[in-house]
Amino acid sequence: MDAGLAVEPAASEAVRNIQCSAAADLDPQALIDPAPQARALDQRLISDDRFRALPPKFRFVFNGGGLTHLADADGDIRADAVSTPEGPRYRIGLAGTSATAHSLGNCKPSQVVDVLVELALIFLEERQRLITPARRMRQLIDACGSSPFAGLRDLSRPGGVMADHPPAPEPGRTRAGTVLGVALGCLGTN
């Protein structure tokens, strides 16, 4: 816990399922570095006891785009960086990948944490209305559609262009010198 890898109480640890584009701050093709928003969401989730009711494996995805994109990562609630005439925004989606999620609209990066928190609270409220509470966003949408999530105040109409996300290199097709294989824990300054 001193290293920041876990939190007290243990029940809060279960809600910390946030996937964020790795090294987006170093990626020249990324539209947004989502790490600050992911850290802020993490703090909101662990500081509010209501989120301990989120089911295990309920996942939030922050996709900044670029080389370290998470366009193909499946998430319950996702924020994908898009380029708009007004500047970079997050496209908010439910239950899926960038291509398959139910798109709700766009929001400013400064609003994304509040929007995702509100969506998670709506999920927690709506799942209890089912005979068997939904464990994933897909189950809730299949049961009652995405209408409970419509009309959030901080969302504008969906639009914009996602950052290019090149496919991962195929094994054996990578130029020599572009990949470094190092055993876990062996890369250091000594």
Residue ranges and their predicted role:
Residues P28-A30, L70, R138-R153:
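Short glycine/threonine-rich loop-to-helix capping motif typified by GTGT followed
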Residues T97-I131:
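Internal alpha/beta scaffold segment
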Residues M1-G93, G105-C107, D114, E118, ...:
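Small-residue-enriched alpha-helical segments and adjacent helix-cap loops
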Residues D25-Q29, L67, A99-S103, R127-R138:
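Noncatalytic linker/hinge segments flanking ATPase motor cores
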Residues T97, M137-D142, A183-L187:
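Active-site beta-loop-alpha junctions enriched in small/polar residues
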Residues F51-P55, I122-C144, D154-E170:
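Flexible, glycine/charged-enriched surface loops at secondary-structure junctions
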Residues G151-A163, A183, L187-N190:
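Rossmann-like S-adenosyl-L-methionine
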